Amino acid sequence: MRFRKRRYIKIEPKEKIEIKKDNWFKCEQCGKLLYKKKWQENLKVCPHCGKYGRMSAMERINMLADTDSFKELWGDMVSGDPLNFMGVKGYKEKLAEEMQKTGCKEAIITGECKIGGVPCVVAAIDANFIMGSMGSVVGEKFTRAVEYVLEKKYPFISVSGGGGGARMYEGAISLMQMAKTAAVTGKLKQAGVLYVSVLTDPTMGGIAASFAFLGDIILAEPGALIGFAGPRVIEQTIRQKLPSDFQRTEFLFEHGMIDIISKRAELKDNISKILKILYT
């Protein structure tokens, strides 16, 4: 018995599509694989478990400001090295590395914009630049932003997201910025100018202990770490086990430290409502 030879259709392979490993990553919380582009389009929130990723200062401003309304102020200011600090690396070398890595000149971006059609002044901290630590330029730009607000009588919006506290490279000059920013923020209350403070993960150290908690209205994203010293440091000091949600947004809300817990996607709308009620 003879068998016919099967005929096979030859399919020419198409050009290979290269999928870069950098385009995918695992969620820190649920371990699901996420496509970076989709994750960024979702405002860096995991679609599976809702874990919030950290955003840069410019990403924050782009999310909040009306399209093409943001104008940066004092963007050319950079830190000096008053102490000629030398550690593993010199301060000047560290600053140069951070500028190249983040595309920012400092850990804060300040400027004016419109949010829901209302003119505002915004100051956003970038945790990617030396952990969002507060040095002389951060304090000076924040102070100038508040003084500009007092002149224009616009609402002031600060977005805090820095866990680095005072910047050790600048010593006492850095510590002084806590008093400086807190003092100038007090002038907003005296002038009756609206100050909305937005707390994001992480809002810690000198930023939490100065201007971040001085807003007339304080909003925070869900699950953000907010406090002065970290929970492990506190546990070691008081020798007691802290609640699992200690220093998280929800814990602070329950204890009256925060006015509104706002999802990231709803943050602009919530701020717009506040501005329309209390400013316009």
Residue ranges and their predicted role:
Residues 36, 131-134, 166-170:
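A generic structural signal for short coil/turn motifs at secondary-structure boundaries
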Residues 115-124, 141-166:
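A structural preference for short, pocket-lining loop segments at secondary-structure junctions
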Residues 163-279:
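Conserved catalytic cores of soluble enzyme domains
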Residues 118, 124-136:
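STAS-typified acidic loop motif
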Residues 106-110, 119, 154-155, 193:
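Short glycine-rich loop/turn motifs
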Residues 1-104, 112-115, 274-280:
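Intrinsically disordered, low-complexity segments enriched in small/flexible residues
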Residues 101-107, 132-147:
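Glycine-rich anion/phosphate-binding loops
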Residues 37, 159, 198-199:
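Structural motif
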